Amino acid sequence: MTKNIKTIPTSDYEEIIATVQHYVDGLRVGKSADVAKAFNKDAVMYGFTNGKLLGGPIKNLYDFVDENGTAPEIKVRLDILGITPTTAVVRVDMEKDAIGADYTDLHTLIKMDGKWQIIAKVYHMYEG
């Protein structure tokens, strides 16, 4: 019989959620520096805002946070959709950001030097 070895420790799940929670907490208080704690310095983001494609460096997100301020009523659900020893994908279901909009984000994370970081964010903004 082959060995059945658990390759992903529970602590990785906790660290991944904690990483994405930095993003959420930064949005709540309206501080891009707090949001940035979740992201790799070279991270990118792409998605549709009001029907127009927005894409490029994660600085676009930081600018949005700086321009629009706090999101005290933000509500989120975080789900790890996939995980390997060095990669993960997290879905962020979000309601009421700083401009009152709702989104679904998919964040791709990588574990480098023992630390989980978001390297890509793709999102869908809902109308209404």
Role assignments for model-derived ranges:
Residues 1-33, 37-41:
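Short, low-complexity N-terminal intrinsically disordered segments enriched in polar/charged residues
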Residues 2-4, 56, 117:
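Terminal "cap-and-tail" regions of soluble proteins that handle hydrophobic small molecules
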Residues 39, 94-96, 122-123:
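Short beta-strand segments enriched in hydrophobic/aromatic residues
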Residues 15, 44-49, 55-102:
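Surface-exposed, charged secondary-structure patches
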Residues 30, 97, 113:
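Residue-level signal for short amphipathic helical patches enriched in basic/charged
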Residues 102-128:
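Short beta-strand edge/turn micro-motifs at domain boundaries
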